[in-house]
């Protein structure tokens, strides 16, 4: 027990720090109101109600975008139940928010202990990694999946380290377990980025093994890790496989639309190039790693919120500074805050580049540079283009600036290695070979901070963005433009200088601790404690700028967002089994950026990062233009739909949009408007018009009346048995008789064979029967379903229950069994070792 006492103390310290940061909100039960979290609640309400009512999970919901799979809405599979139990134990059953910081610290601590670092130094490492500013920016933004995935990456790499340190079985089990946990956390982008880090590590261990003539050991460890990776992946195979299949149909998949000219270069098997690089870190902005507000801070902060800036403000413009411009003046469209790793941490990292020996140092330095260069995105397009075009899967992810998480990992890791070198060898910095490195480190960190403090303009050519200048020219009289720009420049220089002085003095204080230790004036334990306190104060205070107690609200605030309004009540009085609602409140920006509507209704709009690509293309080509026409027409008609031209919104009608929610008054009130022109749940058509490609298909919708003609790609001609003429008259009827999100039942009657179009979103995996006999489903009108229905009276049933889930679940259970066997073997061998010692 005594052996594990330092570890228990470190874990207890992590718990105390986590509770302390979120005090008193954690004690009072207050929560953060997070847009992404609230959006998830709204989008998932139909699925939640179905689970509570039936005890089964639906893999399809009609709550947003007309309908989509639930694979990326809190994905859950039976095979992961036991894994979630293990996760709860690992988290020590700590409450929300508190647990996030705790697992972030614990994961890095495990990694450092795997390297053989002392518990006390590993504890410091856990703190400086976990308190990197980016993580505390993720929490209020609601990017919890990303946060948790990042928390499980250091212990995953710990397994890699253990395996290469010849603890094969333990390393394999740890790797498999934490790969499984991070994939379960469902942010593949972060896992993908850290695959590059692992490759750097493997390269370093290969070099080390080659030099030591231990290549058999290297290949043995690599084989075990490869098996562990397969096990970890297979535990989550249900999620991974269905996410992969789904991604092909989303904006991350390849569009079938052919574009010409410059736009054609954007078309690939992944996201558009501009979309991928829209959030690119500025080259000069990289200095935020050392000085947090080197680009002003966050986009959400006005100039009036900065004391340093307002000390330089011209009182004449104070009213403007309370609204515009924002503190941030970097190259990203918007940012909640900078990526800051700690001034003295950065100092130790740079110092580590000189005093730490071995291939692992070069791996960490290489990974850091790699991360920074790729984070520049459109500001460094040579490398970015290469990765988008040639590196598998890189073009599936947007916001390239987020690859800086690699630097946030490698910088504190090398910093701890450097501190270990210093504390274990007090004369390290006295050595002649290290003096130059120490001087260079001071110049590159404290020196840069000092220059930024004294002359911020030395690194930047301007402090006003192009967009700001354009807005100022529109807003200000010509005679005020130059004085205002000069004053704003002075204020932004003051913001930079304030934080630069801060970083400079933090580095100097840290160096003082090292100097006193080197002079034998301070013991190693006190030096470590002093540095730990310095780093904690530094990073804690920066993080409080972006996540503080004022942001926490009572839990009731979350539910208030979904309180049923009078408009909702009025719409819900409609007992029709299935129809859609289109919310015009906040149009045009809000319709596809909120899920409050989806909480109570089946929405045409919605918010999700991975919507179906064809639906997005319909939004761009038809839905948004029709919304503009409809908004203007309904407003002009004063809500009297009988005087509105229904031909202006045929796509909305074919989506069975029965209700529009329109703003009424200036206090956020809304009113429902019944759309009498909605086509209903399904209809027979007179004609099937086959087209050769997606462009013809989406363009044809401009020229046809969907209730009469169905536009179908020739690829689906066989599914409709080549029918070109449908059959539609007053005797042909079809009615929805039963509705579940994943199962629809219709009664149809027709004197002759005909084609029925359903106002449901087409997606591979939906199956259909007519009177119990399987039939094919075709795609019609770009996004809808169609079936060839024979003459007579029939029951048509459609359901979504992919058989692939059963297959992948079997694989997942087999992988879990392998992991359990590994744990049992490890426990047995450890028990035998203990028995032999006794």
Residue ranges and their predicted role:
Residues 2-747, 753-757, 761:
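Conserved luminal/periplasmic juxtamembrane motif of membrane-embedded glycan-processing enzymes
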Residues 347, 658, 705-838:
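Active-site-proximal, structured, solvent-exposed surfaces of multi-pass membrane proteins
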């Amino acid at each position: 027990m005594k052996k594990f006492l330092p570890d228990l103390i470190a874990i207890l310290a992590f718990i105390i720090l986590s509770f302390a940061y979120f005090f008193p909100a954690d004690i009072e039960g207050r929560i953060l109101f997070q847009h992404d979290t609230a959006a998830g609640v709204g989008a998932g309400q139909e699925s939640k109600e179905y689970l509570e009512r039936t005890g089964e999970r639906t893999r399809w919901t009609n709550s947003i975008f007309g309908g989509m799979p639930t694979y990326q809405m809190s994905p859950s599979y039976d095979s992961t139940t036991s894994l979630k139990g293990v996760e709860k134990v690992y988290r020590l059953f700590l409450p929300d928010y508190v647990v996030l910081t705790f697992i972030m610290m614990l994961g890095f601590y495990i990694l450092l202990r795997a390297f053989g670092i002392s518990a006390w130094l590993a504890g410091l490492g856990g703190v400086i990694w976990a308190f990197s500013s980016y993580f505390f920016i993720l929490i209020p933004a609601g990017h919890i999946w990303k946060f948790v995935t990042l928390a499980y990456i250091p212990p995953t790499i710990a397994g890699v380290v253990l395996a290469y340190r010849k603890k094969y079985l333990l390393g394999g089990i740890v790797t498999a377990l934490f790969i499984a946990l991070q994939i379960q956390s469902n942010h593949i982008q972060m896992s993908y980025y850290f695959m590059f880090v692992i490759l750097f590590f493997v390269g370093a261990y290969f070099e080390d093994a080659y030099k030591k003539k231990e290549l058999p050991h290297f290949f043995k460890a690599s084989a075990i890790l490869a098996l562990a990776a397969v096990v970890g992946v297979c535990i989550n195979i249900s999620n991974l496989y269905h996410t992969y299949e789904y991604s092909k149909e989303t904006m991350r998949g390849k569009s079938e639309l052919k574009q010409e000219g410059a736009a054609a270069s954007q078309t690939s098997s992944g996201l558009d190039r501009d979309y991928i690089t829209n959030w690119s870190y500025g080259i000069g902005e990289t200095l935020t790693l050392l000085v947090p507000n080197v680009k002003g801070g966050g986009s959400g902060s006005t100039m009036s919120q900065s004391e340093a800036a307002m000390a330089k403000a011209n009182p004449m413009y104070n009213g403007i500074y309370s609204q515009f411009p924002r503190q941030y003046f970097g190259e990203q469209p918007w940012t909640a805050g900078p990526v800051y790793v700690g001034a003295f941490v950065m100092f130790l990292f740079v110092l580590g580049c000189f005093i730490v020996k071995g291939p692992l140092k070069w791996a960490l330095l290489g990974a850091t540079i790699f991360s920074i260069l790729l984070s520049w995105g459109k500001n460094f397009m040579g490398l970015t283009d290469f990765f988008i075009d040639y590196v598998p899967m890189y073009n599936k992810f947007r916001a390239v600036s987020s690859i800086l998480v690699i630097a946030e990992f490698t910088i504190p890791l090398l910093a701890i290695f450097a501190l270990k070198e210093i504390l274990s060898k007090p004369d390290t910095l006295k050595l002649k070979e290290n003096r130059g490195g120490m001087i260079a480190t001071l110049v590159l960190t404290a020196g840069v901070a000092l220059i930024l403090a004294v002359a911020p303009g030395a690194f930047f050519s301007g402090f006003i963005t192009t967009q700001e200048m354009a807005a100022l020219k529109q807003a200000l009289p010509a005679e005020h433009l130059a004085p205002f720009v000069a004053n704003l420049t002075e204020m932004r220089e003051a913001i930079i200088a304030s934080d630069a002085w801060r970083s400079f003095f933090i580095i100097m204080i840290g160096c003082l601790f090292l100097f006193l230790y080197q002079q034998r004036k301070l013991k190693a334990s006190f030096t470590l404690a002093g540095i730990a306190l310095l780093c904690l104060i530094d990073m804690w205070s920066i993080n409080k700028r972006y996540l503080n107690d004022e942001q926490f609200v009572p839990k009731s605030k979350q539910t208030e967002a979904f309180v049923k309004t009078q408009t909702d009540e009025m719409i819900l009085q409609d007992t029709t089994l299935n129809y859609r609602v289109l919310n015009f409140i906040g149009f045009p920006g809000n319709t596809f950026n909120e899920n409050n509507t989806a909480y109570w209704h089946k929405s045409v709009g919605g918010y999700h990062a991975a919507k179906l690509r064809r639906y997005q293309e319909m939004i761009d080509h038809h839905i948004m233009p029709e919304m503009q026409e409809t908004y203007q027409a309904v407003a002009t008609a004063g809500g009297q739909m009988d005087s509105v031209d229904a031909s202006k919104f045929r796509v909305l009608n074919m989506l069975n949009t029965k209700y529009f929610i329109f703003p009424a008054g200036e206090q956020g009130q809304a009113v429902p408007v019944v759309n009498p022109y909605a086509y209903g749940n399904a209809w027979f058509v007179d004609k099937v018009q086959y087209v050769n490609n997606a462009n013809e298909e989406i363009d044809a919708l401009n020229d046809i009346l969907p209730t009469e003609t169905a536009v179908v790609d020739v690829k689906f001609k066989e599914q409709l048995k080549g029918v070109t003429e449908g059959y539609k008259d007053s005797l042909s009827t079809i009615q929805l008789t039963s509705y579940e999100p994943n199962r629809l039942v219709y009664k149809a009657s027709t004197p002759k064979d005909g084609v029925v179009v359903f106002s449901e979103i087409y997606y591979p995996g939906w199956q259909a029967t007519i009177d119990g006999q399987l039939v094919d489903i075709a795609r019609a009108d770009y996004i809808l379903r169609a079936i060839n229905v024979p003459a007579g009276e029939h029951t048509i049933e459609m359901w979504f229950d992919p058989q692939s889930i059963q297959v992948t679940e079997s694989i997942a259970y087999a992988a879990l069994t392998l992991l359990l066997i590994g744990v049992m073997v490890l426990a047995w061998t450890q028990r035998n070792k203990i028995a032999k010692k006794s």
